[in-house]
Amino acid sequence: MKLLSPLDQMFARMEAPRTPMHIGAFAVFDLPKGAPRRFIRDLYEAISQLAFLPFPFDSVIAGGASMAYWRQVQPDPSYHVRLSALPYPGTGRDLGALVERLHSTPLDMAKPLWELHLIEGLTGRQFAMYFKAHHCAVDGLGGVNLIKSWLTTDPEAPPGSGKPEPFGDDYDLASVLAAATTKRAVEGVSAVSELAGRLSSMVLGANSSVRAALTTPRTPFNTRVNRHRRLAVQVLKLPRLKAVAHATDCTVNDVILASVGGACRRYLQELGDLPTNTLTASVPVGFERDADTVNAASGFVAPLGTSIEDPVARLTTISASTTRGKAELLAMSPNALQHYSVFGLLPIAVGQKTGALGVIPPLFNFTVSNVVLSKDPLYLSGAKLDVIVPMSFLCDGYGLNVTLVGYTDKVVLGFLGCRDTLPHLQRLAQYTGAAFEELETAALP
């Protein structure tokens, strides 16, 4: 038996029909040369027969709200692994529409919290795979690592198959819960003590992430949402991002944040809704995880420089804030980071459950998260991975999410928005590309 961490429990409790709390990704593969007509169906049957998903994807949530735990079960492959088809010839637009519908549908919380869809019918000798899992069962980095475990750099290798980790039945549930309660209480006291000493200094001085959170303006991104999702995609070349980062002594992530900030500035100007205060983003930072921790990420709030017209000045402001924010988080112990994440998520979770989140002031405007899949090409049973697009979750007051994944020589940005409250989401993706080009022109000699 394994307990859900406080942060994992928070994500489970935030689940609601309008705001499903799963994250996911879809990937497009090139069929191998000479692949038979049954290739995709054979792949579907092979995946259905593999016990390739480790803990907690072989488990369901059990126990009460105060001490939830994972109970191991035998997943039904015919339920979790599905074969779908687009009307041939399926286009990228057709695939996007299907994935939007799949991502809008909540998971069944009474079953293991994941689904995998193989999708045939694409033109150009391609097929797609869509995977989603609840955020209480996986974070962004964990999800990418899981997908990576199915793939290989060897075009001839079969699908990866991890062996499930048995929990065993030889335990006394009452004793385990009692020990866990004591352990959590001790950890909580220790974390509060550490955080009390750090938070006072985090508020002071220039580039404070805490003060940035308290001055976040309300925008069209920060409204009540429904369950219907819209996806937009932008692809940036990694060598070009690195060149700008090197020339400005910043990180690639800073360059992307500045590009997204420039896009938001233009987007909101066109809507007549650009606030005086700069927009802010929640930027996750991973930390060391133990065997019982699924979500091992905290985060800080960084300005996006939407009040700054000059793209290089915008980047400089963002870099100063992210440098301080990352340093402050990395100086904390993993225990303190876990509780810091819970404290930061608590007002969002309470607002979500009470219905007040759409009207109370936001702590940030949206999240921008970044993970790396692989620098090398990857394959699934000989089918080369062409592109992977990440997709996160939304909740009331936070109707936009931007997730990045690095693969080979490109970075793919997935913009997830509420279909009915965020108009023209594709423009935001397009403007991000244009804002990067503007920054590149200004930064490089």
UniProtKB/Swiss-Prot annotation:
Keyword Ion transport listed: no
Gene Ontology biological-process entries: biological process involved in interaction with host; glycerol metabolic process; glycerolipid biosynthetic process; response to hypoxia; response to nitric oxide; triglyceride biosynthetic process
A GO CC term attached to the entry: plasma membrane
Cysteines engaged in disulfide bonds, as pairs: none
Signal peptide positions (record): none
Catalytic activity: an acyl-CoA + a 1,2-diacyl-sn-glycerol = a triacyl-sn-glycerol + CoA; di-(9Z)-octadecenoylglycerol + (9Z)-octadecenoyl-CoA = 1,2,3-tri-(9Z-octadecenoyl)-glycerol + CoA
InterPro entries named among the record's database cross-references: Acyl_transf_WS/DGAT, O-acyltransferase_WSD1-like, O-acyltransferase_WSD1_C, O-acyltransferase_WSD1_N
EC top class named in words: transferase
Protein induction: A possible member of the dormancy regulon. Induced in response to reduced oxygen tension (hypoxia) and low levels of nitric oxide (NO). It is hoped that this regulon will give insight into the latent, or dormant phase of infection.
EC number: 2.3.1.20
GO MF terms held by the record: diacylglycerol O-acyltransferase activity; O-acyltransferase activity
Sorted UniProt keywords: Acyltransferase, Glycerol metabolism, Lipid biosynthesis, Lipid metabolism, Transferase
Active-site feature positions: 135
Biological role: Catalyzes the terminal and only committed step in triacylglycerol synthesis by using diacylglycerol and fatty acyl CoA as substrates. Required for storage lipid synthesis.
The family this protein is said to belong to: Belongs to the long-chain O-acyltransferase family.
Protein name: Putative diacyglycerol O-acyltransferase Rv2285
